[in-house]
Structure formats: C-alpha cells, structure tokens
Amino acid sequence: MTVPFKIPISDLDYCLEQLLDHKPPKILPPETIQQLCHTLKTELLQTPNIISLQSPISVVGDIHGQYHDLLEIFQIGGSPPQTNYLFLGDYVDRGYYSVETISLLLVLKLRYPERVFLIRGNHESRTITTNYGFYTEVLNKYQGSADVWTFITDLFDYLPLGATIDGKIFACHGGLSPSCQQLDQIRAVDRFREIPHDGIMADLVWSDPDVAISDFKLSPRGAGYLFGNDVIDKFCQDNNLVQMIRAHQLCNEGYTSYWKGKCLTVWSAPNYCYRCGNKASVLEILHSNYDSKDPTNGSDGEISSINGEFIGVNTSFESFGDDDDDYNDYRNRFNNSSRLHKQQGVLPGQFFNVFEASKENDEDTLQGKSVNGINFDDELSTSDDTSGSGGNNNKGDFFAAFFQERPKRQQVEYFL
C-alpha cells in the first residue's frame, strides 16, 4: 500500500462542516471517504490489537447509525478534544444514518487521533452489513454504487479488537472466549481480515455475560459464547484486571451491571431501531485509583442521597492537580451534577450519563423512515442551509465550536 499524505486539518474541518452544518447532514463524496479510509488504514497498521488508554475517558456503546443521537452524546458528554472517547463498535446498520455516522467518526479519529479511539464490533463486517442495512443504505445514497461500502468495510478489518484503561479495565465489544485466557493471546491474533465464525476474534465481538451460569455456554446468537462469573473472575485475576466493559446488548435503562460491577454493558443507541423506547448511556471513567485488588467487593466512594436527590459525594479529587487540564472538564461536570443516584457495589470514579432519544430521532420515527425507504432528495440535497453555523470561522477547532453554540440538554446521571 502506498502511504498517503497526511490529510490537512483544514480539509478534515471542511468534512466536519459538511456533516454538521446541514440538516439532513450532507454525505461526503466517495473519493473523500476513500481518502479518509486509506489514510486511517495506514495509521491503524501500526496500532496493536489491544490499545492502551488512560482515564479520564468516556466509553460509548452501540450507535447503529443513529447519527443525531451520536451528536447528543457529544452535546451531553463534551466534544473532542476536551473529552476523550472510546467507541466499542457497531457504528452502522439498522439506523437511518449509518453513512453519516461512520463518516463523522472517521473524520474525528483523523482530526483528534489521541482523543478518539475506535474498536471493532460484530457489525463491522461485510457479511453483517450486507444483511442489516448498511449495504442497502450506501446503494440508496450513492446512486446504486457500492464503492463507499467497500471502502468502509475494508477499513473495518484494521480496527483494534479491544482496549485497556489504566491497565486495570479491559474493554471490547462483546465478551470473553474459551480459547483465550491471556490478553497476550488477543494481541497475537491476526485481525486484518473479515471476522471469522469462531475463535478468539469472533468471541470478542459476539459473546455475552450470563448471570445464570458460571462457566461458558454456547450462545443462542449462533456465534460466540455466554460466559459466567467464574470465567470473568479468572480472566481478571490472570490479567491483573478489576473490570470488563462491553456493549453489544440492548439495555432498557442504557446500561447493565453484572457481578457487582465486575462487568458492565454500555448501550448508546436510545429508542433503538426507532421503536424500542429504551434509554441510552455513556460511561465516564474519571479515574481508577482503587486501593484494593478487587474493588468490586466494596465501595471507596460514599454517596449520600435522600429520595434520589443528590446531597454529597465523598470521592477524592485531590490526587489530580488543578493544573491537570485533561481531568478538569470531567471533574467540573461531576461536581456540578445535581441528580446522582446510588448504585450498589460498583467501582468508584465511574458514572453513567443516561439520556433519551434526540428530537431528530423522534422526528424520523414519526415520519416512518426505513433504511430501504430513504428520501433520496433530502439525503442528496446540495442546497444551502442557513440553520447551521456555516458562518463559523473558527477553523482551529470547528467541532468543539459547533457544540459550544448548541444549548445544553438535560441528562440524568447515575453514579457508579
């Protein structure tokens, strides 16, 4: 592969402008997406299967083409580069705006490479996207051409399979594998290919936790496994971990905690498929300063509340200096929160932003749109739109400036 030149920041900001300043968002031309994918593939060639990240960081679960709800995530949790993000996969399929969603994430990854991190889910696959909407959406939006689908699904082969946070938390899309006991086994996998039907790579994106079992059990999904408490206990012990964070499963409240927080599921697509009515969440990890080897056995931070109203929280921030710019944004949002609720037996320094569907999600639902019934004229319109912030001249940080101009939306926060 020929190493492409580095895409200028001004060009990336122009792509952001096209996606953010128009309603509906403008789709990027095929040649632009090809260049984005080509550049990012070259960079990801040097990226290990498991990326090592540090807190503070926000963890995002499945998005599934719900573009406006992705914007809601940035509105609630802060936009890059002020906030670090780890996305756990399943960016496309089922939602109406898979093209726009993955396009925005690719641009953000190139624009803020040390702030935005993407790993692979089970829908980052040629087979799955052919059957669950993304392929058809590309054909509809690009006059019958599948080129954009090819560019993006080729890129999917390069995405990492997991991440560690502070060396203590393991994050992946799905779950654990009976073929893998050590993180080094994941690091040794050849990931630059389509997701196979079985083996470590498949299990990482397909498996699910199950509180009713202790060991492994074949998954009813037809791929991956169900895994129980003994499995995750041993995996964490063998790899000096305290927790696993994953996505992959719809949660009505936006998240699910298993085994006193040893395993968390984060779900970030509200009103999934525009009919489920579920909430969504983003997990913010402020720190992982745990005193005990297994902090899930107790709580280091004590929350006081009466009838759900926040009174005070005994969580130490003194270990982070006031000059720690990376941490200040997280700390300020935490201290300014007014609706925190107690959760039993989970790790300190973590909380969920729980939110409901954006008004654009509601509008799409009322219009009865479907992946195979997109309004082509609206999607491909090139007419000028003055409703956005097209006059913004802050090209130094277009993305952050876009969200500074939007009103803050109310969110519900659950402390962990």
From Swiss-Prot:
<feature type="binding site">
    <location>
        <position position="62"/>
    </location>
    <ligand>
        <name>Mn(2+) 1</name>
    </ligand>
</feature>
<keyword id="KW-0464">Manganese</keyword>
<dbReference type="GO" id="GO:0005977">
    <property type="term" value="P:glycogen metabolic process"/>
</dbReference>
<dbReference type="GO" id="GO:0044182">
    <property type="term" value="P:filamentous growth of a population of unicellular organisms"/>
</dbReference>
<feature type="region of interest" description="Disordered">
    <location>
        <begin position="363"/>
        <end position="391"/>
    </location>
</feature>
<feature type="binding site">
    <location>
        <position position="90"/>
    </location>
    <ligand>
        <name>Mn(2+) 2</name>
    </ligand>
</feature>
<feature type="binding site">
    <location>
        <position position="90"/>
    </location>
    <ligand>
        <name>Mn(2+) 1</name>
    </ligand>
</feature>
<comment type="similarity">
    <text>Belongs to the PPP phosphatase family. PP-2A subfamily.</text>
</comment>
<dbReference type="GO" id="GO:0061509">
    <property type="term" value="P:asymmetric protein localization to old mitotic spindle pole body"/>
</dbReference>
<dbReference type="InterPro" id="IPR001579">
    <property type="entry name" value="Glyco_hydro_18_chit_AS"/>
</dbReference>
<dbReference type="GO" id="GO:0005741">
    <property type="term" value="C:mitochondrial outer membrane"/>
</dbReference>
<keyword id="KW-0378">Hydrolase</keyword>
<feature type="active site" description="Proton donor">
    <location>
        <position position="123"/>
    </location>
</feature>
<dbReference type="GO" id="GO:0004722">
    <property type="term" value="F:protein serine/threonine phosphatase activity"/>
</dbReference>
<feature type="binding site">
    <location>
        <position position="122"/>
    </location>
    <ligand>
        <name>Mn(2+) 2</name>
    </ligand>
</feature>
<dbReference type="InterPro" id="IPR006186">
    <property type="entry name" value="Ser/Thr-sp_prot-phosphatase"/>
</dbReference>
<dbReference type="GO" id="GO:0004553">
    <property type="term" value="F:hydrolase activity, hydrolyzing O-glycosyl compounds"/>
</dbReference>
<dbReference type="Pfam" id="PF00149">
    <property type="entry name" value="Metallophos"/>
</dbReference>
<dbReference type="InterPro" id="IPR047129">
    <property type="entry name" value="PPA2-like"/>
</dbReference>
<dbReference type="InterPro" id="IPR004843">
    <property type="entry name" value="Calcineurin-like_PHP_ApaH"/>
</dbReference>
<dbReference type="InterPro" id="IPR029052">
    <property type="entry name" value="Metallo-depent_PP-like"/>
</dbReference>
<dbReference type="GO" id="GO:0046872">
    <property type="term" value="F:metal ion binding"/>
</dbReference>
<protein>
    <recommendedName>
        <fullName>Serine/threonine-protein phosphatase PP2A-like PPG1</fullName>
        <ecNumber>3.1.3.16</ecNumber>
    </recommendedName>
</protein>
<dbReference type="GO" id="GO:0090443">
    <property type="term" value="C:FAR/SIN/STRIPAK complex"/>
</dbReference>
<feature type="binding site">
    <location>
        <position position="173"/>
    </location>
    <ligand>
        <name>Mn(2+) 2</name>
    </ligand>
</feature>
<comment type="function">
    <text>Serine/threonine-protein phosphatase that plays an important role in controlling colony morphology, filament extension and agar invasion. Down-regulates expression of NRG1 and affects the expression of multiple filament-specific transcripts in response to serum and 37 degrees Celsius. Plays a crucial role in virulence in a mouse model of systemic candidiasis.</text>
</comment>
<feature type="binding site">
    <location>
        <position position="248"/>
    </location>
    <ligand>
        <name>Mn(2+) 2</name>
    </ligand>
</feature>
<feature type="binding site">
    <location>
        <position position="64"/>
    </location>
    <ligand>
        <name>Mn(2+) 1</name>
    </ligand>
</feature>
<dbReference type="GO" id="GO:1901525">
    <property type="term" value="P:negative regulation of mitophagy"/>
</dbReference>
<keyword id="KW-0479">Metal-binding</keyword>
